[in-house]
């Protein structure tokens, strides 16, 4: 089990629970035994030593089960299973639980410092867990409704005094929220067959991705957790077509990238009269959110520049809550944005 001590494994585990998990209440809960489950992508900070003894195939996600019980005459005790193995049994100083509004049934839980129990307490076995896989955190309309639309005239004020981490070339993280470009609502009817979120980075991937289904940048295989479902099946493919991490390998590696697929989508960037002239996309990476015309443009066969037309794409700032959940879903986002506690 996790060892105690300030800065020790026990404290690191507590910080992991507070900083990288959002919870769902298990239907197996009772008035005497409360059970919550969480799943999160592999952490760059907390790396549990399960020695290969966890559930097979669970390498791309961490599944946590928390059991709270209150023995007669004693404080609330807690036990935690990680990928099927008992990792911690303790007495938390406090446990604060808050319901997240919405249909997903999510909970925020804060754990105070863990103490060793004065006397052993009976630890129930972990109940069987299952959940629908690939549960979507937000649909398109919810993304628009819960995010802040940043007008071009307000861009300077919105980014002033903030330090940003660039994710790929088209997403930015300020320590609390993600900033990214999203297709304007008026144009969503132009692409009804696209199931993915209509972020600019996703569009670029659809235009330039390679054919290797195992390519992580293009297809995101084995790096995503089923956060909204509360449990990641060990046999799942770990793919997400909605994650902000998605950007093709070609776009990540080069500043000038040929358009190889779905060329009709270019009309949503350059307009119906000029999109057919565009053969390549040119990136001008920015360390912070900027005008869309300043970070990406089209290039014709003769080398002429074509600007992205105004009004088609909106700069959004995702809410802090959903930014947090999005971060939990993805190994790449964690690796780039969550370096320590």
Curated annotation (Swiss-Prot):
Keyword match Nucleotidyltransferase: no
One Gene Ontology cellular component annotation held by this UniProt entry: host cell cytoplasm
Source species, domain of life: Viruses
Keywords assigned by UniProt, alphabetized: Host cytoplasm, Host nucleus, Late protein, Virion, Virion tegument
Subcellular locations according to the entry: Virion tegument; Host cytoplasm; Host nucleus
Protein biosynthesis keyword on record: no
InterPro entries documented for this protein: Herpes_UL16/UL94
Database matches in Pfam families: Herpes_UL16
Chief place where the protein resides: virion
Function: Plays a critical role in cytoplasmic virus egress. Participates in the final step of tegumentation and envelope acquisition within the host cytoplasm by directly interacting with the capsid. Upon virion binding to target cell, a signaling cascade is triggered to disrupt the interaction with the capsid, thereby preparing capsid uncoating.
HAMAP family: HSV_CEP2
Record text on subunit structure and interactions: Interacts with cytoplasmic envelopment protein 3 and with the capsid.
UniProt family annotation: Belongs to the herpesviridae cytoplasmic envelopment protein 2 family.
Protein name: Cytoplasmic envelopment protein 2
Species whose genome carries this gene: Equine herpesvirus 2 (strain 86/87)
